[in-house]
Amino acid sequence: MVSFSSVAKRYPGGQEALRDLSFAIGEGELAFITGRSGAGKSTLLKLIPAIERPTSGSVIVKGQNISALKRAAIPYLRRNLGLVFQDQKLLYDRSVYDNAMLPLAFSGHAPKEAARRVRAALDKVGLLGRERSNPIQLSGGEQQRLAIARAVVNRPSLLIADEPTANLDAESAARILEIFVAFNQVGVTVLIATHDQGLVARYGKRVLHLEKGRVA
């Protein structure tokens, strides 16, 4: 599903975010990426949907080499990915329903099918009763659940999340992770970056711990 082979990522000025990074995530797997702030977790996740490209090495996602992927092909790659980043980019002038609908508006789904998918996604994250609300009316945990609903409305085979429980209380954080576990249980591959070792320890799943851009 996802394979990194001798991947390095360097930024202008010489900052090396990742170095000689190799690992593979199998189809249907749930894995956590842990490490301190600055360890390279966010950079790693951004390479998967080609938000950034590796400086060297290969990143293979669903059989496609990210380094060789043409710019025009990137939107097609991302249609099969669910992305939950720290900057949720929710539209605060639109309803919860409209926010969840956004990915489908770009993919040409028939209106009835799109509406069915949106309601199903909101139901899975416990927001079906809030579909007419504005995101500003939601709690931090509810806003994160809305971001997840938007990420899964296209029924992705791979779901990646960068610090999805950051700034949430313990109860909300646990609920967010349970949502990811539930998607994994129906076959979705899930990759989560987090610094919360306590939450990770509860699940007994594979952990990739990064230190200075490498798997420790």
Where are the language model's segments positioned?
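ABC ATPase NBD coupling module
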Residues: 12, 66-82, 185
